[in-house]
């Protein structure tokens, strides 16, 4: 009978079984270096979304059933995926949850949840007031506070405002009321139509042993900031190990009925009257061949909180409120509903997509 003893180093154990770990399509690296020789990545599942960040589930194996789960929590991790062009595409994050699973006496399963550093914002709630600041100023202030108070946050995320192309109103008063930092920041950015994206400082690496770099929180208000893949064209084709390139395997178009007009109003103290958007702004998007937008009559009528006011002498440096703020909300909501009405969803095997 052949008896194989499992060494403490998981990679040595894999080599003993006749498998070469270094030639695999996925590699993992921990900032807690003691884990690198104990944990072997078997499978990765996850999502990466605009305005939602990164969340990954890593299924790992180890020859040790007694790794303290606290060794995983708060550790930075990088997963390198070999693409169809033999390049290493990196995705990283922070381990926020760790589970230990079944063991057959030789190998033990560990499941790790990896999120981008903004996940830490979900664990701080606050109430505070910001005076004479724009939305971008407030986000920058909170970001700087996190960098000062949390070494983990400071070492894992930087703020990138190069994707902002517009000037934003300086508001006299912004309040965070019993809100999580994540909810507060998302609310402010949404009010100005600013998207955020978690990006890698170094998306492609030359070696899986390269140090883990901080990710970037990119603030974006212009679609020109999004870059297409270098390959430009992707085939619609079956997925197979014998194919030379990755492909799109499924493509679905979807339409759904959405509001056809938006109308917003709020109280304007400067003029002592209700200030409205430009009437009921009807969508230019054609929702149906059977009914036009006017006959559908699906209006979203919103009443917002009163417009802000400057100090009596107008010396506080804030932006004067006016119809422009209402028009911006009208436009943003209208564009949102138009995008929801018509969507395309693709499933692919493209490993360097982001």
Predicted regions and their residues:
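Amphipathic alpha-helical and helix-coil boundary elements used as assembly
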Residues: 2-354
């Amino acid at each position: 009978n052949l008896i194989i003893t499992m060494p403490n180093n998981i990679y040595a154990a894999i080599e003993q079984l006749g498998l070469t770990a270094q030639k695999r399509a996925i590699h993992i690296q921990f900032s807690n270096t003691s884990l690198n020789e104990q944990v072997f990545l078997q499978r990765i599942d996850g999502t990466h979304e605009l305005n939602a960040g990164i969340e990954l589930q890593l299924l790992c194996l180890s020859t040790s059933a007694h790794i303290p789960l606290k060794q995983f929590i708060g550790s930075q991790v990088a997963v390198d995926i070999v693409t169809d062009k033999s390049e290493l595409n990196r995705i990283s994050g922070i381990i926020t949850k760790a589970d230990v699973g079944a063991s057959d006496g030789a190998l033990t399963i560990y499941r790790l949840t990896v999120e981008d550093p903004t996940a830490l914002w979900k664990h701080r709630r606050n109430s505070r007031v910001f005076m004479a600041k724009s939305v971008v100023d407030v986000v920058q202030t909170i970001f700087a506070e996190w960098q000062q108070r949390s070494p983990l946050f400071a070492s894992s995320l930087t703020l990138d405002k190069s994707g902002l192309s517009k000037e934003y109103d300086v508001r006299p008063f912004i309040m965070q009321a019993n809100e999580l930092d994540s909810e507060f920041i998302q609310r402010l950015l949404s009010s100005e139509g600013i998207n955020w994206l978690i990006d890698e400082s170094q998306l492609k690496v030359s070696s899986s042993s390269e140090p883990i770099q901080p990710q970037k929180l990119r603030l974006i208000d212009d679609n020109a900031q999004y870059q297409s893949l270098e390959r430009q064209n992707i085939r619609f084709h079956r997925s197979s190990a014998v194919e030379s390139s990755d492909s799109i395997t499924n493509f679905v178009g979807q339409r759904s009925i959405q509001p056809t007009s938006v109308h917003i109003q709020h109280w304007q103290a400067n003029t002592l009257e209700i200030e409205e958007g430009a009437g009921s702004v009807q969508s230019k998007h054609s929702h149906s061949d059977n009914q036009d937008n006017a006959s559908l009559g699906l209006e979203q009528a919103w009443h917002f909180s009163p417009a802000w006011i400057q100090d009596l002498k107008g010396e506080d440096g804030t932006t004067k409120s006016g119809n422009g703020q209402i028009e911006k909300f009208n436009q943003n909501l209208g564009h949102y509903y138009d995008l929801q009405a018509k969507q395309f969803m693709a499933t692919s095997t493209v490993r360097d997509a982001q």
